[in-house]
């Protein structure tokens, strides 16, 4: 049976833990992509499996099934 043009395949999802909470997110996200997916803008410190991910590497480090991430969103103030 041919596919309909308006139907799309669902995006595969993976199970991870973010700040102690289980989540399912799209497969193939980088750490930066995960931050965007979660709606976190600006600076954020991210630890992946107990290892800090430098900000310069957040766009290249992939989030993988079973990862445990701790995210601290940095905000300014006075």
Q: Language model features by range: what are they?
A:
Residues 1-77:
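Ubiquitin-like/PB1-type beta-grasp interaction modules and other compact soluble beta-rich domains
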């Amino acid at each position: 049976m041919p596919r309909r043009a308006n139907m799309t395949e669902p995006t595969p999802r993976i199970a991870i833990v973010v700040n102690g909470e289980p989540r399912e997110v799209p497969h193939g996200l980088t750490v930066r992509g995960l931050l965007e997916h979660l709606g976190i803008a600006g600076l954020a410190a991210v630890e992946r499996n107990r290892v800090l991910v430098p900000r310069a590497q957040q766009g290249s480090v992939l989030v993988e099934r079973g990862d445990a991430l701790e995210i601290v969103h940095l905000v300014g103030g006075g």
